Amino acid sequence: CDTATDYALAKAVRWGARVILSVPCCQHELNRQMKNEQMKPVFQYGLIKERMAALYTDALRAQLLEGQGYRTQILEFIDMEHTPKNILIRAVWDGRKKQNEKELQEIMDFLSVKPTLAALLEES
């Protein structure tokens, strides 16, 4: 699946969805891309890098949605003891596009990543 969540989110934005509820399961893309000399001592531990990549992925997804006019929240929807994949991205259209392009680009440059959702939203 990998980037399936990104395609679903981009499609929801293109369709003008008023509310988006997404439980992302696909966060491998950034794990493969993430490179940063300053973070090398942390990224050398595969498990840590994988978990950080998953969190960065969903945080960037939420911020990209805010740039499209959605107010977003990232929530736990089920107790951690049941599943570690318990993040819900809730996005509600309010039309106020957050001017966060510069900040997001700085983060993506720092991590040497280009999320699929960013590319898909640029196309639309």
Write out the residue ranges for each language-model feature:
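Class I S-adenosyl-L-methionine
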Residues: C1-S124
